[in-house]
Each structure stands twice: as C-alpha cells, then as structure tokens.
C-alpha cells in the first residue's frame, strides 16, 4: 500500500471517528437535557445510547481500519477497543453513573476536551506512527 493510500485511509478513519464522537456527544447532550427537564427515564435512555455507540465503535470502525498497514491498524484498533471495552462494561453493569462518566477522567473540568477527542487529535497528529499511551 502506498503512503498516499494509507494517508487517505487514515483521513477517512479520522473523519469517521469525529462523526461517531459527534453522535456520542449528541446522545449525552440529549441525556443531560432530559435530566434538566426532570425526565429520568429519558436521561437513562440517552446515556444508554451513548454507551451503545461507544461499545460498538471498535467493531464498527473495522472497515475504516482495514486499508491501514498491519502495525498501524493494530495500534488504532487497540486504542478504540479501550473505549469500547469500558462502554461494554458500563452496559453489563447497567450503571448509568458509569455510562455518564465514559470518556472523562476523574479530574475532568467543564470545557476541557474528553478522552476520545484527545485520542482522535493524537491519531490525527501522529498519523501512521500512532501508538497507544
């Protein structure tokens, strides 16, 4: 695979990840709006959707990862699996609190980027040299 083809595949993956992130954030925003309106079942439903989107992310990204070279594909898949595994655990535990905390470190402050945003930014910056931390 040529470097140009790999870079195109990587650009496609980054775009796909940013779109998935936007879906996750939209579900979270809906959940918070429902909570503000006193609609706890609606809040829980949208937090569950957030977790489901993240849980499926690693699997859903496979077609985007396929064109990447082996080691690069592995490193990207490993990073995405970390997010998906946490989300699957929150669903298995049926923990709305855990679902709400997905993507955020313990010391997260409003206005700071979430962990998925930081990861996508690192992927974009490092390109084919991306490694998990």
Question: Where on the chain are the PLM-derived regions?
Answer:
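Short terminal alpha-helical segments
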Residues: 2-48
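Short amphipathic alpha-helical segments that mediate assembly, nucleic-acid/protein binding
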Residues: 6-10, 28, 58-61, 73-76, ...
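Generic structural concept
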Residues: 14-21, 51, 55, 80, ...
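A structural signal for well-ordered alpha-helices, especially hydrophobic packing surfaces
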Residues: 21-28, 54-65, 87-94, 124-127
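Short, charged, amphipathic alpha-helical segments
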Residues: 40-52, 74-81, 114-117
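Short, solvent-exposed, charged loop/turn and helix-capping segments
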Residues: 54-82
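Amphipathic alpha-helical binding modules
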Residues: 81-133
């Amino acid at each position: 695979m040529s470097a140009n083809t790999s870079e195109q595949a990587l650009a496609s993956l980054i775009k796909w990840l940013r779109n998935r992130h936007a879906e996750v954030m939209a579900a979270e925003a809906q959940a918070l709006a429902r909570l503000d309106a006193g609609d706890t079942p609606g809040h829980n439903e949208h937090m569950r959707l957030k977790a489901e989107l993240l849980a499926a992310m690693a699997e859903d990204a496979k077609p985007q990862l396929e064109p990447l070279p082996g080691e690069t594909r592995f490193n990207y898949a490993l990073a995405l699996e970390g997010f998906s595994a946490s989300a699957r655990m929150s669903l298995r535990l049926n923990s709305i609190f855990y679902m709400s905390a997905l993507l955020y470190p313990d010391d997260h402050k409003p206005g700071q980027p979430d962990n998925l945003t930081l990861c996508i930014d690192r992927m974009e910056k490092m390109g084919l040299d991306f490694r998990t931390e």
